[in-house]
């Protein structure tokens, strides 16, 4: 079962589908085991440090990383394209993954991950204007959202920065999710 909550008008412009909430430390430990060292946010927006779960040496590990995949040739942790313009890489459409210069290599290498989330927010457009809706599991257990991870090395400092993106796909066949996002005749 699913709980859907309408978000207050005050939050309307800030949240949209660029927001999710990570479970608190106690719930993370209960559901995922040992916590990583480092700091992360519980209320997530793009480019914040969050958590993802990946396979490691026959097991799994929670990793602190930046939400927003950084292309390999980017000169900054703010994702940029070949032309130097800022990219939105926090969500990646599954349908185009293999052909993407940002996501293609991690996809082919099988760098899938699970993103722990207490809830996530999507824009409802049934009224003709966006109204943020928060989705959470009815039983209160966290979601495990599909993701893809990579590691980027800062060319100026040599620091290794894990990063990740949330996988999305067309949901027109799912009645509730079909109501989300502004209708776009150019996209399936």
Region annotations inferred by a language model:
Residues 2-188:
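Short linear sequence motif anchored by a di-proline
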């Amino acid at each position: 079962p699913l709980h859907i909550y309408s978000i207050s008008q005050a939050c309307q412009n800030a949240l949209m589908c660029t927001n999710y909430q990570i479970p608190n430390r106690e719930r993370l430990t209960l559901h995922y085991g040992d916590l990583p060292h480092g700091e992360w946010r519980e209320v997530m927006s793009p480019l914040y440090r969050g958590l993802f779960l990946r396979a490691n040496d026959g097991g799994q590990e929670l990793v602190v990383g930046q939400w927003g995949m950084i292309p390999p040739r980017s000169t900054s942790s703010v994702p940029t394209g070949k032309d130097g313009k800022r990219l939105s890489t926090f969500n990646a459409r599954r349908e185009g993954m293999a052909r993407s210069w940002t996501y293609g290599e991690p996809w082919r290498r099988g760098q899938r991950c699970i993103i722990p989330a207490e809830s996530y927010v999507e824009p409802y457009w049934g009224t003709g204007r966006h109204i943020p809706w928060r989705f959470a599991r009815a039983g209160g257990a966290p979601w495990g959202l599909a993701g893809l991870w990579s590691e980027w090395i800062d060319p100026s400092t040599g620091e290794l920065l894990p990063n990740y993106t949330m996988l999305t796909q067309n949901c027109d066949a799912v009645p509730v999710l079909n109501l989300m996002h502004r209708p776009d005749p150019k996209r399936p």
